[in-house]
Swiss-Prot record:
Protein name: Membrane protein insertase YidC
Keyword Nucleotide-binding included in the entry's annotation: no
Primary residence: membrane
Role according to the record: Required for the insertion and/or proper folding and/or complex formation of integral membrane proteins into the membrane. Involved in integration of membrane proteins that insert both dependently and independently of the Sec translocase complex, as well as at least some lipoproteins. Aids folding of multispanning membrane proteins.
Cell location: Cell inner membrane
Compositional bias (Polar residues): 37-60
NCBIfam families the UniProt entry points to: PRK01318.1-4 (NF002353), yidC_nterm (TIGR03593), yidC_oxa1_cterm (TIGR03592)
Subunit structure comment from the entry: Interacts with the Sec translocase complex via SecD. Specifically interacts with transmembrane segments of nascent integral membrane proteins during membrane integration.
Pfam families referenced in this protein's UniProt entry, alphabetically: 60KD_IMP, YidC_periplas
Keyword Cell membrane attached: yes
Annotated transmembrane regions: 8-28, 374-394, 445-465, 503-523, 539-559
Molecular function GO labels: membrane insertase activity
BP GO terms, sorted: protein insertion into membrane; protein transport
């Protein structure tokens, strides 16, 4: 590999570090007016958003009692509840406000310890990190209609909600309107809400349906640039909309609006999400908003308002919406998208720019996992398959390297012949390559090939919940987390965690697998002819060390992939070079290195 190709190799490697490793450091229409009415009646503080004079502030939402901090248990006990129990979730529904505000996940725990607490997703208002969803109706501007509010207590026809037994809630406003709400849940994470309003009064009533998901307090995020956490949604036929919490806070009036037919919107964390989903054929006005309660607690909301409907005396109107609250399982989201027709619901997972590679990579890993029962083994097999697919390119690359080695004496002669004329050296070198049919850049093809695979596998390991707490062998119990061992505490002999040190802790996550990766990369470098340029030689010598420190804090599944890929690359290169009759540099370079150590 000549100077030019080595420069390209170096540039690609350092670009990989910059892009991946350092990412750690990082007058409205009627429906609009109906939304404003809903905003004022559902938890929005006065004075920060336009108000509808026809809809009074819901004082019950911000009483001094509610402003007092509560434990989650105290907040749950503050309202009558209806039990929720499915194969995937457990919790309760608040009959006060008919809110879905208590959901925990049966199949997921906080740590790899099977006795650790279940993941708590939704919590009631007043609890720390309140997070809930609700749906209902709001009156049109100028309409003095008593619709259910957050302090309305509904009656239920049963005491538990299960996949086999939907529940129907009822509220009579005493003014001729009777509200019915049927709530059903499937065996995963989807709630279906069917609202109806009977108008038994003597005059028509105009209402609009809405649904929202809200969370109080700024959520804890992992703060990786390669992963989106915050507001997310697909409205109409547009692409996915993603906004961080602080981005919406900085918007004019603290909100951003969208319009279209169907879609979904809500909040996404790394592995969990809560979204509201309208009828996919209905036009909606959607909004992301950020605000604060009178006590200073930040509140974030994703909501939509449907078309305004006029209900004649004796008539009934209906509205349907859904709430997704659970784990972002790939097969579950795909099934909802296909079976329920939810637009682009798979994009609730942040697949990234390399979607066209990341999704196939996940499918391949999942298929191999179904055969082996171990995602770590699936990663090893997937690497072999990728190597096999690109073997023709790798073969061409290594043969080109062999040819370059063969003409190395001629290149050295050109440097001696034109020691002061760099331009002439370059011209004669390129002419030599042309005569010998050598492509100096082709030697970098193996590196170029593995970069998109690296990104795709990194995304799969980092964002898909299927990789969370997936074990390998030995001490690796979670492929999505860094190697738990650490060189700097002598692999657990010293009672401290070097990764918790400020500023430098992230770069001290040097476990067994990162060390193996560094060694394998060093060996791979030594499999190539050493560069003539002293500076390049130093850079390539230190590159394995840089990668070891940088990738040490990455998911160990990615480090295992990189290590295995290096081993396969060295084996592949050795085989191809021997078949081409070219001497393999690896053993001579390693021997030369140790001779220098002994001599010094």
């Amino acid at each position: 590999m000549n100077k030019d190709s080595r420069n390209l190799y170096l540039a690609i490697g350092l670009s990989c570090l910059v892009i991946v490793g350092w990412s750690y450091i990082f007058a409205p229409k009627q429906a609009d007016r109906a939304r404003l009415a809903q905003t004022q009646s559902q938890n929005a503080p006065a004075g920060t958003q336009p108000q509808s004079a026809a809809t009074p502030q819901d004082a019950a939402n911000f009483s001094p009692l509610d402003a007092l901090p509560k434990t989650r248990a105290e907040a749950l006990a503050a309202s009558p509840r209806l039990k929720i129990d499915t194969p995937a979730i457990f919790g309760s529904l608040s009959l006060k406000g008919a809110r879905l505000d208590d959901v925990s996940l049966k199949g997921y725990r906080e740590t790899v310890d099977p006795n650790s607490p279940n993941i708590v997703l939704l919590s009631p208002q007043g609890a720390p990190d309140a997070y809930y969803a609700e749906a209902g109706f709001v009156p049109a501007p100028g309409e003095a209609v008593a619709v259910p509010r957050s302090d309305t207590v509904w009656t239920a026809d049963r005491d538990a909600l299960t996949p086999e037994a939907p529940v129907t809630l009822t509220y009579d406003n005493g003014q001729g309107l009777v509200f019915h709400r049927q709530i059903a849940v499937d065996d995963r994470f989807m709630f279906t809400i069917k609202d109806s309003v009977e108008n038994k009064s003597a005059k028509p009533v105009t209402l609009a349906s809405y649904a929202l998901v809200a969370r109080h307090g700024l959520p804890k995020t992992v703060n990786y640039a390669v992963l989106h956490e915050g507001f997310v949604g697909v409205i109409g036929d547009a692409g996915v909309q993603e906004f961080h919490y602080d981005k919406i806070e900085k918007e004019d009036h603290g909100y951003k609006t969208f319009s279209g037919a169907g879609g979904w919107l809500g909040f996404t964390d790394k592995y969990w999400a809560a979204t509201v989903i309208p009828d996919q054929a209905a036009p909606i006005e959607a909004r992301f908003s950020a605000n604060s309660t009178p006590s200073g607690i930040k509140t974030y909301r994703a909501d939509f308002v449907g078309p305004v409907q006029t209900i004649a005396p004796g008539a009934t109107t209906e509205a349907m919406s859904r709430v997704f609250a659970g784990a972002k399982e790939v097969h579950t989201l795909d099934a909802y998208q296909a079976d329920l027709g939810i637009k682009k619901f798979e994009l609730l997972i942040d697949w990234g720019w390399f979607y066209f590679i990341t999704r196939p990579m996940f499918r391949l890993l999942h298929f191999l996992y179904s055969l082996t029962g171990n995602f770590g083994v699936a990663i090893l097999l997937a690497t072999v398959i990728v190597k096999g697919l690109f073997f023709p390119l790798a073969n061409k690359s290594y043969l080109s390297m062999a040819k370059m080695k063969a003409v190395a004496p001629e290149i050295a002669a050109l440097r001696e012949k034109y020691p002061e004329d760099k331009m002439k050296q370059q011209q004669e070198t390129m002419a030599l390559y042309k005569r010998e049919k050598i492509n100096p850049v082709s030697g970098c093809l193996p590196m170029l090939i593995q970069i998109p695979v690296f990104f795709a596998l990194y995304k799969v390991l980092f964002v898909t919940i299927e990789m969370r707490h997936a074990p390998f062998f030995g001490w690796i119990h979670d492929l999505s987390a860094p190697d738990p061992t650490n060189l700097f505490n002598l692999f657990g002999l010293l009672p401290f965690d070097p990764t918790q040190l400020p500023l430098i802790g992230h770069f001290l996550a040097i476990g067994v697998w990162p060390l193996l990766m560094g060694v394998s990369m060093f060996v791979q470098m030594k499999a190539n002819p050493e560069p003539a340029d002293p500076m390049q030689k130093q850079i390539f010598t230190w590159m394995p060390v840089i990668f070891t420190f940088t990738l040490g804090g990455f998911p160990v599944g990615l480090v295992i992939y990189w290590t295995w890929n290096n081993i396969l690359s060295v084996s592949q290169q050795t085989l191809i070079m021997k078949r081409a009759g070219v001497k393999v540099e690896l053993f001579d370079n390693l021997a030369s290195l140790f001779r220098k150590k002994v001599t010094s």
